[in-house]
Amino acid sequence: MKLSKYIDHTLLKPQATEKDILKLIEEAKTYDFASVCVNPSWVKLAYENLKDTDVKVCTVVGFPLGATSIASKVYETKVAIEDGADEIDMVIAVGQLKSGNDEYVKEEIKKIVEASRDKLVKVIIETCLLTEEEKVKACTLSKEAGADYVKTSTGFSTGGAKPEDIKLMRETVGKDMGVKASGGIHTREEMEVMIENGATRIGASCGVELVK
């Protein structure tokens, strides 16, 4: 697979304007990235501009805290798909996981997988807030709930992707799931290290620099 197809070209800053999003979309077309990842209010715009290409539209759910209710996340997912999203990056309820409420976390992922139908679901576990044991548990619950990917980070918390976390996540989910490294990846060398450790998707706001 060529390097560009690893990349979710991402712009999730709250102050991003329509002009910024359109620039992101054009870059994704030019460099043939896997997707653009945008906030839900920009999904329709992205869909309209990418529907005749093979660049997917990715959006976020329960972002960035993961602390909204399951019902809210399910509704967000359904609306995003109606608006044209191909991929859903959802944030788990980190506090529920850390409280040992495994069934809650598994249920919310399962409900979003069900709501997404045939669309791709990536589960953001926010590795920087978890212990090693919690990282393994989050990955295991994601797999049991039927998600397609596990993802390291929102990029809005205390840290981003680390190679050792990618390795642990890959070892936990096996070969059947995707692993997305996101947050703090700024160079091609950093991206290649993530891929070597098991990442099959890279979330980055500097996608153009990574493939130039």
From Swiss-Prot:
Active site per UniProt: D89, K151, K180
Native species: Clostridium botulinum (strain 657 / Type Ba4)
UniProt keywords, alphabetically: Cytoplasm, Lyase, Schiff base
Alphabetized SUPFAM superfamilies for the sequence: Aldolase
The encoding gene: deoC
GO molecular function: deoxyribose-phosphate aldolase activity
NCBIfam families in alphabetical order: deoC
Superkingdom, taxonomy of origin: Bacteria
Keyword set includes Lyase: yes
Pathway: Carbohydrate degradation; 2-deoxy-D-ribose 1-phosphate degradation; D-glyceraldehyde 3-phosphate and acetaldehyde from 2-deoxy-alpha-D-ribose 1-phosphate: step 2/2
EC number: 4.1.2.4
Protein name: Deoxyribose-phosphate aldolase
